[in-house]
Design a protein with these regions (language model features):
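Positively charged n-region of N-terminal signal peptides that target proteins for export
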Residues: 1-4
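Extracytoplasmic metal-acquisition and chelation regions
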Residues: 19-309
């Protein structure tokens, strides 16, 4: 099944004095949404390299310079990409930035308390422990996996770009409306694809799929790692192994950014099938306006294929 957002770009006359802002984005799904809103007017820059981990990334000097010089930075927030926070704080006061996690219209969910186990924190390093506490005592930052948030953000991005570039405000708005309609159609397709299998329990590599699961009513029985993909403790692995050995979990999913060895070890002898590798941030996809649809649609297809097998 292919999932494609068709973007009908509004045709507008060229305005001689229009100055399209340079836009920098943090992760592929945000980059895709901004690219759809900008359309033919400009191309946003993506910071997260292909195949990189959004939780643990280092900006190159050229990227830090791009952040410093950007007319607008659109990002999720420090809860997801703390490596971008310091670069943003170094920008001049009043420099334009749009943090999507903190946007009033963003639908948020908290990490489940079941995801925190005392053993995890007793056996991990101080640095990792601090990171786990930070990731799991607040809101789950994987907010783009709810397509409703994607639709809301398109409007926010268009408004912000229109404020910086009034001459092209109507184009940004038209592009955002077309893209939002595409996400709505995609959402209906995904819901129909997952409906026959949504009650079947699955386990994921890390706790990144709460928004996707809640939106589509999926039955996530647990995850190997916490929301920041830090190494799990022995007690956590033991509990999850017991869940798998009970025989109710049908599929366990690795991720493209992480070695599948631990998933294979956990699944061995349990009867749980190992599904295709999930890609919650789209790090394996070709960046561009179609990446958001490809991310959500591909995730749905991977889950459905394993549960139907």
């Amino acid at each position: 099944m292919r999932y494609i957002i068709t973007l009908a770009l509004a045709a507008t006359p060229t305005v001689a004095l229009a100055e399209v802002p340079t836009v920098v984005t943090d992760i592929p799904p945000v980059h895709a949404l901004v690219a759809q809103v900008m359309g033919d007017l400009g191309q946003p820059e993506l910071l997260l390299a292909k195949g990189a981990d959004e939780h643990d990334f280092q900006l190159r000097p050229s990227q830090a310079a791009a952040v410093a010089d950007a007319g607008l930075v659109v990002w999720i927030g420090p809860e997801l990409t703390p490596w971008l926070d310091s670069a943003l704080k170094a920008r001049p006061e009043g420099a334009a930035a749009l943090g999507l996690l903190d946007a009033e219209a963003t639908e948020l969910r908290a990490y489940g308390e079941v995801e925190k186990s005392p053993d995890d924190h007793a056996h991990e390093s101080h640095d990792t422990e601090e990171h786990d506490d930070h990731a799991h005592d607040g809101m789950d930052p994987h907010v783009w996996l709810d397509p409703g948030n994607g639709q809301v953000w398109l409007e926010l991005i268009a408004v912000r770009l229109g404020e910086l570039d009034p001459a092209n405000a109507a184009t940004y708005t038209a592009n955002a409306e077309a893209a939002a309609a595409g996400i709505a159609a995609l959402d209906s397709e995904i819901a129909a694809r997952l409906a026959p299998v949504k009650d079947k329990p699955v386990v994921t590599f890390h706790d990144a799929y709460g928004y996707f699961g809640a939106h589509y009513g999926l039955n996530f029985a647990g995850s190997i790692a916490l929301g920041d993909a830090a190494s799990p403790g022995a007690a956590r692995l033991s509990d999850l192994r017991a869940t798998l050995e009970a025989g109710e979990v049908l599929c366990i999913f690795p991720e493209v950014q992480h070695d599948p060895a631990l998933v294979e070890q956990m699944a061995e002898g349990t009867g749980a099938r190992i599904g295709g590798a999930l890609d919650p941030v789209g790090s394996s996809l070709e960046p561009g306006p179609g990446a958001y649809a490809a991310l959500l649609g591909g995730m749905a297809e991977t889950i459905a294929e394993c549960l139907e097998g």
